[in-house]
Amino acid sequence: MIELVDVCKAFGRQRVLNHLDLAVEKGETTVIIGRSGGGKSVLLRHLIGLMKPDCGQVLVDGQDLARMNNRQLKEIRKSFGMLFQDAALFDSMNVGDNVAFPLREHTRKRRAEIRDIVEEKLASVGLSGVSDKMPSELSGGMRKRVGLARALALDPHIILFDEPTTGLDPLMADAIDTLIRDTQARTGATCVVISHDLAGAFKIAHHIAMLYEGRIIAKGTPDEIRNTEDPVVRQFVEGRADGPIKVV
Amino acid sequence: MLGRPFLALVEGFGRIAVLFFSAMAWAFRPPFRLRLLVKQLEFVGVRSFWVVVITGAFTGMVIALQTYYGFRMFSAESLVGGILALSVTRELGPVITALVVAGRAGSAIAAELGTMRVTQQIDALASMAVDPVQYLVTPRILAGIVMLPLLVVMADFVGYVGGYFVGVKLLGINSGMFMAKTLELMEMSDLMNGLVKAAVFGLILTTVGCYKGYYTSGGAEGVGRATTDAVVISSLAILISDYFLTAVMF
Ligand SMILES: Nc1ncnc2c1ncn2[C@@H]1O[C@H](COP(=O)(O)OP(=O)(O)O)[C@@H](O)[C@H]1O
Ligand SMILES: [Mg+2]
């Protein structure tokens, strides 16, 4: 269970999160939608302690990340996996070493065992036999899938995805969404996915939350969101430029 | 009224110091990342070898030439060996080597860490429960502190040999006198103090490179800015600290 309570975050005068509350159900997928530049990545970074809130609490299983010291943070991060927006693969390492990295850092497994796990994780994202390639040799979709394999390496309980399908062609985007849904179903992990791709969100989400002007203004099942009366959420879901949200 | 630029300078100093001390604290805590250290020793040291040899040799040669023309006016050519040894070991070896390495390795460190920052690789490290300062910064600073003195020993040596070649072989100074004056004027402490300077310069250029890279923002343009800044700031810091180190040591 992850809970954000009254979280604020500002950069200089710009208030990005403004007394935000959000509860993420354990073992389910919550998709957070919202406009570009609306603070979705900032929100996600708070969930893993990469940013600290100016006020409020970030509770993971009842413990407040915002008050943890480095050692405690490090310990709790071992149960997290995160897929970054552009995958953030280490470009000085080949694909196999990227996926092996968390295993080498945090387990005492032997070389052969690590190699087997790496192959298994890569196979589970549909990429076999690319271990020796460098990240720069891969397409965007392949990089994301390698990033996913790396995020899954330690079998995390909580997986965070920052725009996993942005910038991909529709077929690849659908393949990634399917991968996320299957991974969640297989592992029972708690998943938080950031997206502005509504079709994908409806496909993978148990819950959808909308971030608008620094707060979660609506949260519900995909059906509830689809049929909402809230004019702001309606405008976003229908993808219209005119409405309560000022677009330009 | 202190003014904004001054405050920014003080703040920058503070943040560099914090980065440096946390990197050093991590050096004494496991996991010890020997393989990363070796890689950085190679990058900062071994790959600067030839450029340091060449700059060192020509520095020694030009010093021999200049002092010869100067001292000939007083018929004191025999002093060239001693002056050469002193100026190379005390000043030119450490300073020129440090400036060259700042341009070569300091800038590369800033560019590499800057790229990792803007492509979120540093966040990825942290998200995988690896401390990015320990993983990235500590080995680079240690490599600077260890490798600069070794490079400077090399630069001192080829500088002296280059100066000897110009003074004795080209300009005809008596070889025995050249050596005798060297031994008479120079002491072991000159060499050692030069190496202490080298270690400080190594610390400065790697710390500044890491700082600029680690705190890069603003995409590819930001990486470019970090790289240039790293070279400019570390060059200034090397020359300024050289004055104060000299004032304290000699
Ligand atoms: N480290 C930072 N420093 C300053 N401003 C930031 C930082 N991170 C994000 N912002 C600002 O916060 C706002 C929200 O950014 P972000 O969370 O990345 O949006 P998105 O919803 O597209 O992911 C943006 O205006 C961005 O400029
Ligand atoms: Mg974002």
What are these regions (language model features)?
Chain A
Residues 48:
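Helix-to-loop junction immediately C-terminal to a conserved catalytic motif
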Residues 63-64, 111-129:
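Conserved ABC ATPase "signature" region
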Residues 134-138, 142:
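Conserved ABC ATPase signature
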Residues 153-157:
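A short, proline-enriched helix->beta-strand linker immediately N-terminal to the Walker B motif
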Residues 159-162:
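Catalytic Walker B motif of ABC-type/P-loop ATPase nucleotide-binding domains
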